[in-house]
Amino acid sequence: MIILGIESSCDDTSVALLDCSPKGHFVLSEKIASQIDIHKKYGGVVPEIAGRAHAEKIVPLIEAVLKGQPHPDAIAVTYGPGLITGLLVGVEAARTLSYALDIPLVGINHIEGHIYSVEVEKKIEY
């Protein structure tokens, strides 16, 4: 199964295409747009500025990740917790693509994503 992942909960816009099979999970393509330089002068992340930067970057990142790759079978997107402006950009981009491509959309909790990300490297026995 090919999954398009979208993450925009704070100050980075991240998009990745994953091949998830019984043999493992493989990153086919990934792009990240950092906002560190944008927020540096403010001493922290400014939610409104972050949201605008996500809106500017998300479509070009999705296009770049999908270029020359297989079409996704599903889309996974961070729905929270996080900064509402960034989350709205990511969720609406994911919803639009899901509708246009007629593929499933799965919401991912940001904190749970961190917890389960350790399984990318090594399967955890429960």
Regions found by a protein language model. Name each.
Residues 1-126:
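Short acidic/glycine-rich loops and adjacent helix/strand connectors
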